[in-house]
């Protein structure tokens, strides 16, 4: 089993400091949404993020990168064989558990709407089956709850190795960062296995794809 953990993901609802901003409220009215139930999205709110959090507008409000990664993970052979579990840990210490049967909407706007519903209801079901669930949980608490043989961290400053050199058939928890720049907010210093798989910067979905595909090869699916 591969547990793919996207840690410190920049996925959040509108922060309290921004709730009364006239521009944000106009955007909410345009979407016919309550301001406090909207997901922060820098694609539309870049200027507002920069206004309230100077220097963070390239990092915060990035549900788009989570969407791309989940499209890859949920459609993978590994997931279709029920050997992948995907978790989104957010900057505010929520954990979203993605059921293997869940398929992401093909439309990005529908994805945003789905996750806005999740933040409001804390669970999304279909025909009695849980597709998505959300709960308060820190990264170390999530790791503690998983049955695994090893925990690995993908990090630009980790030991440079090909995935085939450290991915095995064991049950592995693989942590990748859910942000486009900067470093982990959570304390990951106690994770002994830290690896870098490429000399240059990669997108989080590229890293996720390499890890998933390498695990598929290791267990003989490819």
UniProtKB/Swiss-Prot annotation:
Superkingdom as given in the UniProt entry: Archaea
Relate the protein's function as given in its record: Methyltransferase involved in ribosomal biogenesis. Specifically catalyzes the N1-methylation of the pseudouridine corresponding to position 914 in M.jannaschii 16S rRNA.
Do you know which InterPro entries this protein is assigned to? Alpha/beta_knot_MTases, Rbsml_bgen_MeTrfase_EMG1/NEP1, Ribosome_NEP1_arc, tRNA_m1G_MTases_N
Provenance organism: Thermoplasma volcanium (strain ATCC 51530 / DSM 4299 / JCM 9571 / NBRC 15438 / GSS1)
Q: Where is this site: Stabilizes Arg-62?
A: 64
Its name, as the record gives it, is Ribosomal RNA small subunit methyltransferase Nep1
**Gene behind this chain?**
nep1
Q: What class of enzyme is it?
A: transferase
Its Enzyme Commission number(s) read 2.1.1.-
GO biological process per UniProt: rRNA base methylation
Please give the Gene Ontology molecular function terms for this protein: rRNA (pseudouridine) methyltransferase activity; rRNA binding
Q: What are the alphabetically sorted keywords of the record? A: Methyltransferase, Ribosome biogenesis, RNA-binding, rRNA processing, rRNA-binding, S-adenosyl-L-methionine, Transferase
Query: Entry's HAMAP family?
Result: NEP1 (MF_00554)
PANTHER family for the chain: NEP1/MRA1, RIBOSOMAL RNA SMALL SUBUNIT METHYLTRANSFERASE NEP1
The record's catalysed reaction(s) read: a pseudouridine in rRNA + S-adenosyl-L-methionine = an N(1)-methylpseudouridine in rRNA + S-adenosyl-L-homocysteine + H(+)
């Amino acid at each position: 089993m591969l547990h793919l953990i996207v840690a410190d993901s920049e996925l959040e609802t509108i922060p309290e400091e921004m709730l009364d901003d006239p521009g944000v409220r106009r955007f909410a009215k345009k979407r016919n949404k309550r301001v406090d139930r909207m997901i922060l999205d820098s694609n539309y709110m870049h200027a507002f993020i920069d206004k309230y959090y100077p220097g963070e507008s390239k990092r915060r409000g990035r549900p788009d990168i989570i969407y791309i990664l989940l499209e890859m993970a949920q459609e993978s052979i590994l997931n279709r064989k029920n050997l992948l579990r995907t978790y989104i840990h957010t900057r505010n210490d929520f954990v979203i558990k993605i059921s293997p049967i869940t398929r992401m909407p093909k439309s990005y706007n529908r994805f945003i709407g789905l996750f806005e519903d999740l933040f409001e209801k804390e669970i999304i079901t279909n025909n009695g089956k849980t597709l998505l669930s959300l709960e308060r949980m820190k990264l170390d608490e999530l790791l503690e709850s998983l049955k695994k043989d090893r925990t690995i961290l993908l990090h630009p400053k980790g030991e440079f190795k090909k995935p085939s050199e450290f991915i095995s058939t064991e049950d592995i928890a693989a942590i990748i960062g859910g942000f486009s720049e900067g470093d982990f907010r959570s304390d990951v210093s106690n994770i002994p296995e830290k690896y870098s798989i490429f000399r240059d910067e990669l997108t989080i979905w590229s890293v996720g794809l390499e890890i998933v595909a390498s695990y598929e090869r290791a267990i003989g699916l490819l």
